[in-house]
């Protein structure tokens, strides 16, 4: 996953991300700027997942939403 491409499309994907991870606020999602590592960190923190679980969820999310 190319973080630059993700960042460029992030505004289009924030609604889908909010649907996937409803406990994250719009502001938090905006602040990640589509950065996969930041997003995974938020998911890890908010949902109590391991780093690997959060990274896998983020990777799968971006694979489903190219």
From Swiss-Prot:
InterPro entries: CsbD, UPF0337_stress_rsp, YjbJ, YjbJ_sf. Belongs to the UPF0337 (CsbD) family. This is UPF0337 protein BP1738. SUPFAM superfamilies: Hypothetical protein YjbJ.
């Amino acid at each position: 996953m190319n973080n630059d491409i993700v960042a460029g499309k992030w505004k289009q994907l924030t609604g889908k991300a909010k649907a996937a991870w409803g406990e994250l606020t719009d502001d938090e999602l905006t602040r990640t700027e589509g950065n996969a590592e930041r997003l995974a960190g938020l998911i890890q923190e908010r949902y109590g997942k391991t780093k690997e679980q959060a990274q896998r969820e983020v990777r799968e999310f971006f694979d489903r939403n190219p």
